[in-house]
Amino acid sequence: MNGVNEIRAAFLDFFRKNGHEIVPSSPLVPRNDPTLMFTNAGMVQFKNLFTGVEKRPYTRASTAQKCVRAGGKHNDLDNVGYTARHHTFFEMLGNFSFGDYFKPLAIELAWKLITEVFDLPKDRLLVTVYHDDDEAYDLWKKIAGFPDSKIIRIATSDNFWAMGDTGPCGPCSEIFYDQGEKLFGGPPGSADEDGDRFLEFWNLVFMQFEQRGPGDRIALPKPSIDTGMGLERIAALLQGVTSNYDIDLMRALILAVAQATGVDPDGPMRASHRVIADHLRASSFLIADGVLPSNEGRGYVLRRIMRRAMRHAQLLGAQEPLLWRLVPALTREMGQAYPELLRAEALIVETLRLEETRFRATLARGLTILEDETRHLSEGGVLSGEVAFKLYDTYGFPLDLTQDALRAKSLGVDMEGFEKAMARQRAEARKAWSGSGEAATDTHWFALREQLGATDFLGYDTEKAEALIQAILQDGKEVLRLEAGQSGAIVLNQTPFYGESGGQVGDTGLIIAPGMRFKVENTHKKLGDLFIHEGIVEEGAVVPGLEVRTLVDHSRRTAVRANHSATHLLHEALRQVLGDHIAQKGSLVAPDRLRFDFSHPKPVTPEEWTQIEDIANSVILENAPVTTKLMSIEDAMGSGARALFGEKYGDEVRVVSMGYDEDKADDSTDGRIAPPFSVELCGGTHVARTGDIGLLTIISESAVAAGVRRIEAKTGSSARHHLNTQASLLHSLAAQLKSPEDEASKRLSALIEERRKLDRELSEARKKLAMGGGSSNGADSPLREIGGIKFFRRAVTGVEMKDLKSLADEAKQTIGSGIVAIVGVGSDNKASVVVGVTDDLIDRFDAVALVRLAAGKLGGKGGGGRKDLAQAGGPDGEAAEAALTAIEESLGSSLPTP
């Protein structure tokens, strides 16, 4: 029992047997926690349990949590590959008590696991405790039988953990393993504690206090336990190796890199193998959890990780994209423990392949600039911060990649200069943004929300309601009155109008009172629950305190509801046809159409398109109920509801289920109720039954970003109108083609192919005509000799530039040695000119110089190309012969007379 998968299973099994709920790893994108970029510890998903905000049906839990540290406070990126234990991705094993057991059992369980299950030798173990934690000190003596020398008191923050400036906190006890005298280092607390000999592998946090402010700390009525053990670290100990990169899992990935590149994994390029193995894990798991490479936020961190790995692939000599070819090795090692890797394998592979293909050009440009800028620097030198910033800002070359490339040359970066350039850019961005009024407006919303409280939303149950005007705004400022003809915004105490959010557009309609009529043109939602009704006063005046009646535009709301429900059906149909890697990346729900962005590495085929439509429409035809339930976020996720990654949800969420009819049983399940077709967390408005959608038809599919596709669709009457238009178009097309409608496509394809064939024949005929014939004698001949050099000149009409080039190439082959000049005149009388020089003459003649002479005669400027072939143009086609004569005269003056 010392393989990584066996160790993970043994840890969880031990705590299962000791009454702990085994909770699956949460995603790397923290749910409902905007303070974190990535999940970086096992306790992240339990934060609300520790603070008492949330309750769950268990008080003991254990997890194997996937973690990423590559951004913000916890950033290990720069060290990865160069040390024995730094990673961007790692697994943290942990056990947790939420007001259940405390120090005695926590220490007892830890000791039993490491000495009885993991069978670590007791004489190699030692622990630290916080300097005044006498209870933990005494418990270690009692349970483990440690002498005083093996229990080290530490007074620093290393042994005291806090969630923040306020909140739960408490002392820690860290467990260390002595790896022996072969490694340098001293015990914790000593001058040499940073060495590798004494390895900390498990941290027990005793949450027994609440920090209420500076110097204000009280005891918690129900203390808790939070522990974290690095899986890679304990695996290294159990496998008898001193580096995490030598454990079985990492070694398998490193050997896959070596096999793909043919480079010794234990030679001078060892660090590059390690970087790729680590970054492959981080990149793949992030993509599987819905993160895609981009230029901001989490996507940018992912891009940095991927590009650093790609840089090291280039150092290993990889001539083609490498990372995507390593994904099968990763899924073999970790797919069983984390099935999301298997579900998203196609997306991971394609995302890595596309990103690396794009980055190769960026990498080449960046490395060329680096080479030029560092050529004059000696060992220990520093690259200008301005240059490093230019690489980052202009060429998309992350700073850590620049630092990594310079590390091999023993060079550094002027970080102060880089930060100054970055600060200057931010200041310019702020300056460009200032004056928009957005910052002041946002501040105003906070003040207004605090003054008025939340707007009570009634729109799930009604489209009409009585309300009271609480505030009026115009140009972002609060006013006391709006007259007829004036535009502004109204805040009500309650409203049936849906505020734009979650991709769904805001409602429109009317707000009326005796003698007053306000047309609502849009509804926004600020700060989550403050509804702003924008529009224009059509009659009377609007004043605060006025009692009004609200009327949502029913037909528009009905169309929006249908489109929103259709996006849910479309989402699930996409997953069923394309795979479980499908994740929503954005949406628009409008009355006339819907738009759905989703993660997928390649275009949807026509066959898949049809399947997706058929599946969604089959659920619509069932006319099954659409049900909505309010439940806790935990219960919702436990029920299988899908949530958007990175979306912030409250303690209570709306769960929308479709394709579930409690009055019908599924014959295939022996009378049991069939599961819902779609279950999602959603705050939007929906139809009562799927049949209310009427019909769904996809009208387009396209790419919007790397690894992100977009489908646009219509429902109901809009869909019928679209299909009727398409049918009319097909009928008209078939009539013009004189073919049955079901054969129109085949007939059109045949005509297109026939047209292409005629175009090719016409092009060949024009080229033959342009080449002409005859000998080198006579003034009208296209071929003449000047000073012993053959010169072919020709002015033609109706020949495109691409054909001019092929004409020039053909003429060069025909004459064998010489110079070719051809001018083509279009129907608009504009001219194009091509000059070609055979290879044996390019040391004497330059096609670019000659073509520029012709361009001048044609009224053009410049010209470009190579010494053997160049092109130019001009507006004066009448001067075609003059342009050719200019080239001929230039040749005549530069060549000796025979």
Curated annotation (Swiss-Prot):
Main location: cytoplasm
Keyword Nucleotide-binding: yes
Co-factor: note: Binds 1 zinc ion per subunit.
Organism: Beijerinckia indica subsp. indica (strain ATCC 9039 / DSM 1715 / NCIMB 8712)
Gene Ontology biological process terms from the UniProt entry: alanyl-tRNA aminoacylation; negative regulation of DNA-templated transcription
Reactions performed catalytically: tRNA(Ala) + L-alanine + ATP = L-alanyl-tRNA(Ala) + AMP + diphosphate
HAMAP family according to UniProt: Ala_tRNA_synth_B (MF_00036_B)
InterPro entries according to UniProt: aa-tRNA-synth_II/BPL/LPL, Ala-tRNA-lgiase_IIc, Ala-tRNA-ligase_IIc_anticod-bd, Ala-tRNA-synth_IIc_core, Ala-tRNA-synth_IIc_N, Ala-tRNA_ligase, Ala_tRNA_ligase_euk/bac, DHHA1_dom
One GO cellular component, as annotated: cytosol
CDD domains assigned to the protein according to its UniProt record, in alphabetical order: AlaRS_core
Organism domain of life: Bacteria
Free-text domain note: Consists of three domains; the N-terminal catalytic domain, the editing domain and the C-terminal C-Ala domain. The editing domain removes incorrectly charged amino acids, while the C-Ala domain, along with tRNA(Ala), serves as a bridge to cooperatively bring together the editing and aminoacylation centers thus stimulating deacylation of misacylated tRNAs.
Keywords: Aminoacyl-tRNA synthetase, ATP-binding, Cytoplasm, Ligase, Metal-binding, Nucleotide-binding, Protein biosynthesis, RNA-binding, tRNA-binding, Zinc
Molecular functions per Gene Ontology: alanine-tRNA ligase activity; aminoacyl-tRNA deacylase activity; ATP binding; tRNA binding; zinc ion binding
General function of this protein: Catalyzes the attachment of alanine to tRNA(Ala) in a two-step reaction: alanine is first activated by ATP to form Ala-AMP and then transferred to the acceptor end of tRNA(Ala). Also edits incorrectly charged Ser-tRNA(Ala) and Gly-tRNA(Ala) via its editing domain.
PANTHER family from the UniProt entry: ALANINE--TRNA LIGASE, CYTOPLASMIC, ALANYL-TRNA SYNTHETASE
Residue positions binding Zn(2+): 564, 568, 682, 686
Species classification: Bacteria, Pseudomonadati, Pseudomonadota, Alphaproteobacteria, Hyphomicrobiales
Protein name listed in UniProt: Alanine--tRNA ligase
Cofactor(s), by name: Zn(2+)
Cell compartment(s), UniProt: Cytoplasm
